[in-house]
UniProtKB/Swiss-Prot annotation:
Coiled-coil regions listed in the entry: 664-695
Signal sequence, start to end: none
Organism: Alcelaphine herpesvirus 1 (strain C500) (AlHV-1)
Encoding gene per record: 9
GO cellular component, one term: host cell nucleus
Main EC class the enzyme belongs to: transferase
Record PROSITE patterns: DNA_POLYMERASE_B
Name of this protein: DNA polymerase catalytic subunit
Similarity field: Belongs to the DNA polymerase type-B family.
Superkingdom field: Viruses
Cellular localization per UniProt: Host nucleus
Keyword set, alphabetical order: Coiled coil, DNA replication, DNA-binding, DNA-directed DNA polymerase, Host nucleus, Nucleotidyltransferase, Transferase, Viral DNA replication
Gene3D superfamilies in UniProt: DNA polymerase family B, C-terminal domain, DNA Polymerase, chain B, domain 1, Helix hairpin bin, Palm domain of DNA polymerase, Ribonuclease H-like superfamily/Ribonuclease H
Length: 1026
């Protein structure tokens, strides 16, 4: 018999049956705690004696005691037994003496110096070595860390699939200063470094000529480049010099960025290292199979290779014990009881590996490796060492930045005094923590996981950015993207399953593993890992910063590289707010129902094309007060724009090409080349990489305008941003005026073919009914759908060639068969392919019950697809609302009334299932903390309490229906659906019908002068109210 020390009060106090489907070699497993009464545990042959000085604190569920199986709560013990796991027949130490952990594969770590190393890099981590590390590195590199110096750790894999860390020595950081006089610069620098406690690490001052990227200039300035071997010293020195009057440039550029930009390297790709020196195992500073040291000059990048090595991506999910409601990491008893780990090897042939870490015995699960742990502490050590030693390069999960990681790190640090930073890839200056934005930060801010040497991808954040759903629960997203439904388990059932048998814990484990598998499938669906690496490559930033650090850093590093090639240096951002400006506006919609083709044309890459066409940039900007300084410029050398602060000028391309325009031109040319290559590509993997490359370029191009327009950004220039939006508005107005003056005769000249007009429309014409930022909606009256589709491209192309300079381009995007135009950014219509397109429109509130949604959708389908209804809707939209009460309703309109009448009849005769009339609202906090209880779900809570029924817990959704009541408040009508159905309580049919009327009115309002109240009145006028 194999003995577990699953803490009971005496040895072998109770036993759990073995799993039935898959059998172990032993007859049974035992919960056993020999340490409470002085018993000694049997020592496995593979086990060494634990260090007596190390005492481990464990929290044990009381349900592990034989006489308290059904009880909740925990008790604490302290023993010298090190973290332990059980796998099949074996008892394992999580941290054995002969290797770093039970997951480590020491046989792969045969590291020796070689002539050349080909390896792929996925992350770059900056650390600082001091002189006391000299004994651990080669002699010729020691000068780079005396008294201290930067070391860049390049993490990746070799061509033979071994994880590797290449430590690059000799990379410096530098910045620039400008002043009227430099006579005291050397003294000022030394004084500031001494005052701030920084030694002159690799200090070097050099005079050079640079142009400032802060306005148009034809001359360079003498500046000093100050080079150091420490980023913290650079920040302190730059701040100190700025305070005494020096103008500072590029002091916000770290060593990794200098390494990439200065050498034209990449943050993700293949490298060669010449003569790498193997780091002795005793001095290894990274948790990788191999580790080498080299100098910056030994590194060469291979841009031609696009293939990936076999990187490991881990998807994980946790299950927590929440006996008194939703789990809270701050409660000792709300422990983590299971962690599922699904490991997918990118580009590998082997099937993804599923691992379940479980507290307590657990039956075997098919295709899952089950590791059992005596306590949560052992489980956490098992998980942390897996992250560190299994060869994981990327970690994903669902909402892991906001829940799973914070929960795990909270438990580890605050309950067990485990240091998470000991379990990242890096030993020196290691990071592993969750950064949570302070309250009041911009609402889109979210928590970020900082983990040295690991890329974290939270698929919850990815799905929120890419999808538009009513909610973003994993089940909803999986159904939308994968067509799969998640088998869910309520957190209320978790304690019951955990306290049950090993079979019950296996059932819980299956749910846990399932969630991690779904997340891996979502990552594969969106190819997020490839997308973020391609963005990282184009933007010169580490992959781990793509999802967490926003758009600003992407453009900044690219601008830095482009500026460097033309001897510009970037100023530091100015603190303090700049005045705002008017953003993109729209041509106000002419609301109504259009039963005629509506052509939608839009500007391809509007803002990037404006920047290119008008040569907008920091490098071409001339403020009004500075214009007299440039006596060599004529009026034809610059373009003037009237923005809110007065005139602003930009030098034209024939004088100097804008830095931003040059950058955009290079990117877009590269994108065009990639798309051409993509058309010819036959390899599926390479097609995915190329597609993500062109998408990364598109995303980065579209970020340039936003980069200039954020007042608190890295290099804001609101004059550029406002000029861009001004031109966008002007272009929309010009296009509107031009298109509305196009005649049939002129259109035929444009198209070079005969344009057919509908015979019942002797005077065909175009009218712009809406303009939205970069697109125009053109009503094509007197033309058939097929004709509009045929001439759309020609009309758009001709308009852009007549009105605008290259590369501004107008394109035919889509054609609506019919369109309901409500208000700005809100419309519904049927496209030429018969699909319904909705923008900014919720047919009904997302919280509405199923029946209200069904009736509303039925009306929408009728309105968009029934010819009689469409004719009636268009006729009504051209008439005053008051006419509806004076004349007989149109036949098509009566079809809508028939649907409403039928719904009312079904409600009155109780034909609608109660389930379809049910609403639900979350109990977000304890009932007693609500300031008012006159809310439907709280009213039901009170009724359940009065009837002594089981009460919902915090974060439960409380279901309710509305029934007939003598009360005056809506909450008085709320009732528990089960109780209402069992007691045959009549539903509040009039209340539900009113919801239907308002839902339908929300759709039909465009027909009745966009007046929802008037629409409701019209509908009530024609329905049959008993």
């Amino acid at each position: 018999m194999m003995c577990f020390f699953f803490f009971s009060l005496q040895p072998c106090l109770f036993k759990l049956p073995l799993p039935l489907p898959l059998k172990k070699n032993t007859a049974m497993l035992s919960f056993w705690n020999p340490y409470l009464r002085g018993f000694k545990a049997p020592t496995p042959a593979t086990k060494s004696k634990p260090k007596a000085s190390t005492i481990y604190h464990r929290l044990i569920p009381k349900c592990f005691k034989k006489d308290e199986r059904e009880n909740g709560g925990i008790f604490a013990i302290e023993t010298a037994i090190p973290p332990t796991a059980f796998y099949l027949d074996s008892e394992l130490l999580v941290l054995p003496e002969n290797k770093s952990s039970l997951w480590a594969n020491e046989t792969l770590g045969n590291c020796h110096s070689i002539q050349e190393l080909m390896f792929h890099v996925y992350d770059i981590v900056e650390v600082v070595y001091a002189a006391d590390r000299c004994d651990s590195i080669p002699p010729h590199l020691q000068a780079d860390i005396v008294p201290s110096g930067i070391v860049l750790k390049l993490y990746g894999r070799t061509e033979t699939n071994q994880s590797v860390c290449v430590n690059v020595f000799g990379q410096k950081v530098y910045f620039y200063v400008y002043n009227d006089s430099y006579s005291n610069l050397q003294r000022d620098v030394q004084h500031i470094l001494q005052e701030t406690g920084h030694r002159s690490t690799g200090l070097h001052l050099c005079s050079t000529q640079k142009k400032f990227l802060s306005g148009y200039s034809t001359s360079s300035h003498e500046v000093y480049q100050i080079t150091l071997g420490s980023s913290s010293a650079m920040r302190s020195l730059a701040s100190g010099l700025e305070q005494i009057g020096y103008r500072v440039f590029e002091a916000n550029v770290d060593a990794s960025t200098r390494f990439i930009v200065d050498n034209k390297f990449s943050t993700f790709g293949w490298y060669t290292c010449t003569s790498p020196l193997a780091r002795p195992r005793v001095h290894q500073d990274a948790h990788t199979h191999l580790e080498y040291d080299c100098s910056v000059g030994d590194i060469q990048y291979h841009a031609e290779r696009l293939d990936w090595p076999q990187y490991n991506i881990l998807s994980f999910d946790i299950e927590c014990l929440g006996e008194s409601g939703f789990p809270s990491a701050d409660k000792d008893e709300d422990m983590i009881i299971q962690i599922s780990c699904v490991i997918w090897t990118v580009g590998g042939d082997k099937k993804q590996e599923c691992i379940l870490l479980s507290v307590g015995t657990c039956d075997l699960i098919e295709n899952v490796k089950v590791y059992e742990f005596p306590s949560e502490m052992d489980l956490l050590y098992g998980f942390f060492t897996l992250l560190r030693d299994y060869g994981i390069e990327m970690i994903t999960g669902y909402n892991i930045c906001n829940f799973d990681f914070p929960y795990i790190l909270n438990r580890a640090q605050n309950v067990y005094n485990i240091k998470p930073e000991d379990f990242s890839k890096t030993k020196t200056n290691s990071l592993f923590y969750v950064y949570t934005p302070q309250e009041g930060n911009f609402m889109r801010s979210h928590s970020k996981v900082k983990m040295s040497g690991v890329v974290v991808i939270d698929m919850y954040q990815v799905c929120r950015d890419k999808l538009n759903l009513s909610n973003y629960k994993l089940n909803t997203v999986a159904k939308e993207c994968l067509g799969e439904k998640k088998n869910d388990v309520s957190y209320k059932d978790i304690p019951i399953l955990f306290k049950g048998s090993s079979k019950d814990r296996a059932k819980l484990g299956m749910y846990c593993v399932q969630d991690a598998v779904l997340v891996i499938d979502l990552l594969k669906h969106f190819m997020t890992h490839i997308e973020i690496t391609e963005i990282a490559k184009i933007a010169n930033i580490p992959t781990r910063r793509v999802l967490s650090d926003g758009q600003q850093i992407r453009v900044f590093t690219c601008l830095l590289a482009a500026a460097q090639e033309r001897d510009y240096i970037l100023p530091m951002p100015v603190t303090g707010s700049q005045e705002g400006y008017q953003g993109a506006t729209v041509i106000n919609p002419i609301s109504g129902f259009y039963n005629t083709p509506v052509l939608v044309v839009d500007f391809a890459s509007l803002y990037p094309s404006i920047i290119q066409a008008h040569n907008l940039c920091y490098s071409t900007l001339i403020k009004q007060q500075d214009l007299p300084k440039f006596t060599n410029l004529t009026a034809n050398d610059y373009e003037t724009f009237m923005i809110s602060g007065g005139p602003v000028h930009f030098v034209k391309k024939h004088k100097t090409e804008s830095l931003l325009a040059s950058l955009l031109k290079t990117w877009l040319a590269k994108r065009k080349s990639i798309k051409k290559e993509l058309e010819q590509c036959q390899d599926a993997k390479m097609k995915t990489i190329l597609d993500k490359q062109q998408l990364a370029i598109k995303v980065t191009c579209n970020s340039v305008y936003g980069f200039t327009g954020v007042a608190s950004g890295m290099l804001p220039c609101l004059m550029i941003a406002e000029t861009v939006t001004l031109q966008g508005r002007t272009m929309l107005e010009k296009t509107k005026q031009f298109v509305e003056n196009v005649t049939v005769e002129y259109l035929q000249k444009i198209c070079n073919f005969e344009v057919q007009c509908l015979p019942q429309h002797p005077n065909p014409k175009f009218r712009v009914v809406y303009g939205d930022t970069d697109s125009l909606f053109i009503k094509c009256e007197g033309f058939a759908m097929d004709t509009v589709i045929k001439f759309g491209d020609a009309l758009a192309s001709h308009t852009s060639s007549v009105l605008f300079a290259s590369p501004i381009k107008l394109e035919s995007e889509k054609v609506f068969k019919c369109l309901m135009l409500l208000t700005k950014k809100r419309y519904v219509g049927i496209l030429s392919n018969n699909k319904i397109l909705m923008k900014g429109v919720d047919l009904v509130r997302k919280t509405a019950c199923v029946y209200v949604q069904e009736v509303t959708r039925a009306v929408l389908e009728l309105l968009l697809r029934d010819e009689e209804v469409k004719v009636a809707a268009q006729t009504l939209s051209y008439s005053p609302v008051a006419n509806c009460f004076k004349t007989e309703p149109l036949l098509g309109f009566l079809k809508i009334i028939d649907i409403l009448n039928q719904s009312y009849s079904d409600l009155k005769s109780n034909k609608v299932p109660v389930a379809n009339l049910t609403y639900s609202t979350e109990l977000s906090k304890p009932f007693t903390e609500y300031k008012t209880t006159n809310l439907p779900h709280l009213a039901v809570y009170k009724k359940l309490a009065m009837r002594n029924e089981e009460l919902p817990q915090i974060h439960d959704r409380i279901s309710y229906v509305f029934v007939k009541s003598n009360g005056h408040l809506v909450s008085d009508m709320a009732e528990d659906p089960t109780y209402a159905e069992q007691n045959k309580i009549p539903i509040a049919s009039d209340w539900y019908f009113d919801k239907i009327i308002h839902g339908v009115a929300n759709i039909l309002q465009c027909v009745f002068n966009n007046n929802t109240s008037a629409t409701v009145e019209v509908l009530y006028n024609f329905v049959r109210n008993p």
